[in-house]
Amino acid sequence: MNNTSFMILGIFILTLLGVYSIYKPFLLSLSVAILLAMATYNIVNQLSQKLNSRLAGTVISTMMLILILFVPMIYIATSGVEYISQLDNTAITQTVDMAQKLLQKIPLINEYAIDKINDDQIAKFVEQSSAYLATAGKAGIGFAKNMFLVLLFYFFINYYGVAMFNFIKPLIPVSEERFQRMSHEVSSTMEVVLYSTIVTAIFEGFLFGIIVSYFGFNGLLFGIIYGLASLIPVVGGAIVWIPVSLYAWSTLDSVSAIIIALYSIIIISIVADTFVKPIIIKFIKEKMLHSTVEINALVIFFSIVAGMSTYGFWGIIIGPAITSFLIAIIKIGVDYKAMSDT
């Protein structure tokens, strides 16, 4: 490299650092928008072809994303707060007492229940919760801002995506065939993860909403909450149905609480999550998306856990995307090695 090349490289690196410093606050939202655009690329293309307009296809796909992301959050933020404010405080206290008695009967947890679930700890928890609720508005505004940026970037990436791709294509240091295969691997994984996550969350939330509405609870509200909770690995919907069943025990009767608990365990956790969910994923993968990419369910599970622990809510999308991108890069490296050996 001559002096001119070094100078150009240095200017390029400085420019990248400057761009990074300017756009750093938007990198997470931009990354999520790019991944969502990759996951919905086929749908946007089909809509654009049927409507004979890229703008119309982009607008409709963005509106669908708003319906899926924004509407449930707004409903929880409005109806959820109003519903919680109407709960019976006496019943809540009875529910906590009941939980304490139940935990004390479990050998390995009884000492923890005595130390952590008592009047002093509950009072401390209420005080901390009040402080959290006081700042929840700021957090909610921040999340809404990030979601708005994701939707904004998503719209422009879909609308100008082809032009942007053609602009950066000459800079990609791999052949077009390998790049197409790598992007197909990542986008196919994102499609399966995104669509199966949305469908199973709606399905499980619908099942829980039916049972709680039968016993007089707000089925739509708790269905949405349960659907979002089901996205959390390991614990999932248990963080919803356990408090609801205990509250039903205090306000209704023991039979209602047992029915809610058994229904949540047997119908949702065992039947729906264990047996129906794989069928839904297989149907989406083979019949709807016609994807041939083999996805290890365990790898996807741990990538979602790691993604959520690092990036929070958006980790559901970022975790599998980064993992699938790594796998695609490794496959390209293996191909290069095989070519060099021959």
Language-model regions, residue ranges each:
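Membrane interface segments of multi-pass transport proteins and intramembrane proteases
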Residues: 44-57, 163-187, 283-292
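Membrane-water interface of transmembrane alpha-helices in multipass transporters/channels
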Residues: 25-32, 214-224, 253-260, 295-296, ...
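Anchoring transmembrane alpha helix of integral membrane proteins
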Residues: 1-75, 327-342
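Alpha-helical transmembrane segments and their immediate interhelical loop/hinge regions
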Residues: 142-251
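Hydrophobic alpha-helical transmembrane segments of membrane transport and translocation systems
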Residues: 258, 263-342
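Short, amphipathic, aromatic/basic-enriched membrane-interface segments that mark the entry/exit
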Residues: 1-5, 118, 191-195, 227-234, ...
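Juxtamembrane membrane-interface segments in integral membrane proteins
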Residues: 43-46, 50, 73-149, 161
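Hydrophobic alpha-helical transmembrane segments
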Residues: 8-31, 129-167
